């Protein structure tokens, strides 16, 4: 009788596995697989789950948080590659407070309103914090953080140091001991003041360099030694940025694709308003950058003149601008460049998208232009160029930097660029209707100065996930 029951259970379980495998095969066939570590194991959903939560400094911008997601994805990918006993999930922190958003308070926005989550799930196991909270609450087994050893003997140290958690200072993390005799003794704020997370244990790890390999080793050891289910990594933006080839070799460099609806909105703008991809685009950042003297951003008036020069030089007829000072930029164009204002285009948020979604739409429009002009100090710019490299728009002449205003007499600023060119194009100057001649000699030289960044910082492969979305491809 027992054998009969056992056989029935075995047959039922086997049938369930076949059905679930078939369901997965049908749903995932719409997405190109890339030899994934966990999905290749047909029994992965039967493994015991482990969870890694993380966050960044309070208020950090959207694009930095995207970078950190790349770093943490690499940690998860490597954990699942090395450990066949458990399945490791990355818990995505909600969006509540960002210093760059005009509306700084939000109620736990999820990642799926910004990114295509199916693509990420195709490579690493993920779960939104709201779903984790339903299962386990606002708690975790360990709260840990990492910091850099800054003393002169740091590089001589053979092993990392393990310290009390409060030695990993994190601004506004509100670490406190909530009780002494309960399971979850400790509390920290989580993900832009979304909530507080309680933990059973806390630790700080320090080393002269904090790589994804160190994080991988530390969390794997904690999971096994303490037989725990979850770890929160506070301030995970201290983890070193991986090289693009590391991300490529681990199938991660192109998994952060924008939400499909936002891509379609951007493509509709390109097709209906710009008519084709034969336009230049630009990111002008002023709000906080004009206060940072080392960034040396040019005035809006000079920036607009330079954009016109670049447009004429490249034989284009449209300039799309993404900027945090939209009204002021439009005011300058209307006041000083009235005869050229028909060349300039700005995205209008007619569908009442969240401002973070608008930024993504504008990034996509910029990514698909024939030439992009950005700011080397801006992560917003960097992520546009990252997208451009993933859709074969990574050639040197296709990505230009606006240059700091003092580029021609500032050696420190010059060293930030791979190449600087001085191109006087007579026909382009003529098209500017003598406006060029009203500027000072310093301004004139700045206008014809073109700066180029380092391509080694970006991927070099066409993204299989983006191919079908490229307009006019």
Curated annotation (Swiss-Prot):
CDD domains, sorted: O-FucT-2
Assigned GO CC terms: endoplasmic reticulum
Subcellular location(s) of the protein: Endoplasmic reticulum
Signal sequence coordinates: 1-25
Binding site for GDP-beta-L-fucose: 59-63, 283-285, 379-380
Marked site (Essential for catalytic activity) residue numbers: 387
Catalytic reaction list: L-seryl-[protein] + GDP-beta-L-fucose = 3-O-(alpha-L-fucosyl)-L-seryl-[protein] + GDP + H(+); L-threonyl-[protein] + GDP-beta-L-fucose = 3-O-(alpha-L-fucosyl)-L-threonyl-[protein] + GDP + H(+)
Pathway(s) it belongs to: Protein modification; protein glycosylation
Main location: endoplasmic reticulum
Keywords: Carbohydrate metabolism, Endoplasmic reticulum, Fucose metabolism, Glycosyltransferase, Signal, Transferase
The protein's Enzyme Commission number: 2.4.1.221
EC class: transferase
Gene Ontology MF terms in the entry: peptide-O-fucosyltransferase activity
Chain's role: Catalyzes the reaction that attaches fucose through an O-glycosidic linkage to a conserved serine or threonine residue in the consensus sequence C1-X-X-S/T-C2 of thrombospondin type I repeats (TSRs) where C1 and C2 are the first and second cysteines of the repeat, respectively. O-fucosylates sporozoite proteins CSP and TRAP. O-fucosylation regulates stability and intracellular trafficking of TRAP but not of CSP. Dispensable for parasite transmission to the mosquito vector and/or infection of the vertebrate host hepatocytes.
Family per record: Belongs to the glycosyltransferase 68 family.
Name the UniProt record assigns to this protein: GDP-fucose protein O-fucosyltransferase 2
């Amino acid at each position: 009788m027992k054998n009969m029951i056992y056989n029935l259970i075995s047959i039922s379980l086997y049938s369930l596995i076949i059905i679930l495998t078939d369901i997965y095969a049908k749903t995932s066939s719409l997405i190109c697989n890339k030899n994934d570590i966990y999905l290749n194991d047909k029994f992965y959903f039967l493994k015991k789950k482990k969870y890694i939560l993380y966050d960044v400094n309070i208020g950090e911008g959207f694009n930095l948080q995207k970078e950190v997601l790349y770093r943490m994805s690499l940690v998860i990918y490597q954990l699942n590659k090395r450990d066949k006993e458990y399945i490791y999930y990355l818990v995505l922190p909600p969006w509540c407070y960002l210093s760059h958003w005009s509306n700084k308070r939000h109620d736990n926005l999820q990642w799926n309103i910004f990114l295509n989550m199916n693509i990420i799930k195709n490579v690493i196991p993920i779960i939104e914090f709201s779903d984790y909270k339903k299962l386990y609450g606002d708690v975790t087994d360990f709260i840990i953080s990492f910091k850099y050893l800054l003393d002169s003997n740091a590089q001589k140290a053979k092993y990392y140091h393990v310290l009390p958690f409060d030695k990993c200072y994190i601004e506004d993390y509100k670490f406190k001991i909530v009780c002494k005799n309960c399971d979850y003794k400790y509390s920290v704020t989580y993900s832009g003041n979304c909530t507080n997370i309680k933990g059973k244990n806390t630790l700080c790890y320090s080393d002269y360099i904090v790589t994804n390999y160190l994080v991988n080793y530390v969390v794997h050891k904690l999971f096994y030694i303490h037989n725990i289910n979850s770890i929160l990594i506070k301030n995970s933006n201290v983890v070193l940025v991986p090289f693009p080839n590391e991300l490529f070799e681990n199938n991660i460099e192109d998994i952060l694709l924008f939400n499909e609806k936002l891509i379609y909105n951007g493509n509709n703008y390109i097709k209906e308003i710009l008519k084709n991809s034969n336009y230049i685009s630009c990111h002008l950042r002023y709000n906080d950058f004009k206060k940072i003297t080392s960034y040396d951003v040019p005035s809006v008036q000079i920036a607009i003149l330079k954009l016109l020069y670049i447009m004429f030089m490249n034989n284009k007829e449209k300039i799309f601008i993404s900027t945090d000072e939209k009204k002021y930029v439009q005011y300058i164009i209307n006041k000083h460049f009235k005869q050229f204002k028909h060349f300039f285009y700005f995205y209008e948020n007619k569908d009442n998208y969240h401002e973070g979604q608008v930024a993504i739409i504008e990034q996509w429009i910029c990514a698909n232009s024939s030439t992009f002009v950005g700011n080397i100090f801006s992560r917003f710019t960097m992520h546009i160029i990252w997208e451009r490299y993933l859709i074969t728009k990574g050639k040197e002449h296709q990505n230009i930097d606006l240059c700091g205003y003092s580029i021609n007499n500032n050696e420190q600023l010059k060293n930030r660029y791979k190449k600087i060119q001085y191109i006087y194009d007579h026909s382009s100057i003529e098209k500017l209707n003598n406006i060029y001649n009203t500027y000072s000699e310093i301004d004139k030289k700045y206008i014809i100065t073109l700066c180029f960044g380092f391509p080694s910082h970006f991927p070099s492969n066409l993204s299989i996930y983006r191919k079908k979305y490229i307009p006019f491809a």
